[in-house]
């Protein structure tokens, strides 16, 4: 796969995992970004808002825009990190992925609290015990903002049972269906457990009544990124844009960066082992292997690709 690196220092600071990494010449705007204090960077990283300076930087890096040429793919939902719309990418036959149908983000509430305690069954070892429900990240105003701006109907939560301890409904509110589906990422995406969770997840995207759908784990990076990679590949998004969309997660947090590159390579390698000349065809092979038909793939594309 052709590799591309983001022209933001914090995004490529740990890019040593890429053997082909080349440090680019920085523009004046990028140098100004690097001069920001850590607190200022954090403010920019945390959920870049519509048409912010960061979004403009992405735009100048040939990021493909939605059909109107104006809308950034970053979305602002107060309190929620790393939120963006799949809409605006270019897919099969040059068709644009529809906006407002699939959102990816960090979780709408914190993980449940946990602590390590002595494991009575295994002397000398510790085990993690989960307790209490994770604190909500949304205010009432933020929930109202979501209803007015996104209208999410389905909250697809990819976190573990422990992370979602004591949860029974979506933090977005009673009008949203919470679907808890513990899922895998990267190389584990191709394990039997990974395939079973992906089968549950993909079925949701075949029913138009479920849309708009929000997909998240805790950070919106690994588990979310792996599922979104499959969905985008099925829609015919180019290899370059698949990689760039994964890299964009590094924008929102200084702790999510290219250190995960070897794991991402396992995801790419897993698809490369499947039948198909292109990533799109390999994604089709994966979906067929977990029990879906060509008609299902066509249905998903009809929902997600603009005419």
Model-identified regions with their sequence ranges:
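Cys-dependent protein tyrosine phosphatase-like superfamily
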Residues: 19-214, 226-307
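Sec-dependent N-terminal signal peptides
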Residues: 4-13
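Ser/Thr-glycine-rich phosphate-binding loops at phosphate-binding pockets of nucleotides
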Residues: 219, 223-224
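N-terminal signal peptide c-region/cleavage motif recognized by signal peptidases
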Residues: 13-19
């Amino acid at each position: 796969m052709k590799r591309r690196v983001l022209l933001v220092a914090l995004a490529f600071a740990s890019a040593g995992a890429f053997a082909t990494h080349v440090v680019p010449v920085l523009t004046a705007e990028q140098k100004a970004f690097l001069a920001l204090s850590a607190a200022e960077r954090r403010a920019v990283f945390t959920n870049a808002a519509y048409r912010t300076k960061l979004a403009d930087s992405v735009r100048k890096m040939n990021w493909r825009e939605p059909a109107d040429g104006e809308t950034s793919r970053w979305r602002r939902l107060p309190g929620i990190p790393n939120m963006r719309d799949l809409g605006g990418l270019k897919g099969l036959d040059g068709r644009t992925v529809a906006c407002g149908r699939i959102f990816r983000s960090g979780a709408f509430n914190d993980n449940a609290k946990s602590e390590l305690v002595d494991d009575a069954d295994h002397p000398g070892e510790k085990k993690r015990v989960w307790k209490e429900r994770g604190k909500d990240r949304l205010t009432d105003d933020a929930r109202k903002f979501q209803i007015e701006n996104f209208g999410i109907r389905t909250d697809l939560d990819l976190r573990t049972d422990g992370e979602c301890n004591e949860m029974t409904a979506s933090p977005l509110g009673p009008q949203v269906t919470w679907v808890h589906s513990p899922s895998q990422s990267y190389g584990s995406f191709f394990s039997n457990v990974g395939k079973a969770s992906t089968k549950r997840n993909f079925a949701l995207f075949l029913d138009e009544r479920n849309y708009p759908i929000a997909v998240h784990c805790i950070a919106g990076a690994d588990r979310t990124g792996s599922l979104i990679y499959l969905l985008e590949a099925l829609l015919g998004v180019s290899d370059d844009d698949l990689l760039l969309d994964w890299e964009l997660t590094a924008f929102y947090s200084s702790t999510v960066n290219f250190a995960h590159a070897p794991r991402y390579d396992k995801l790419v390698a897993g698809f490369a082992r499947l039948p198909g000349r292109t990533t799109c065809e390999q994604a089709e092979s994966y979906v067929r292997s977990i029990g879906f038909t060509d008609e299902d793939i066509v249905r998903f594309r009809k929902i997600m690709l603009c005419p």
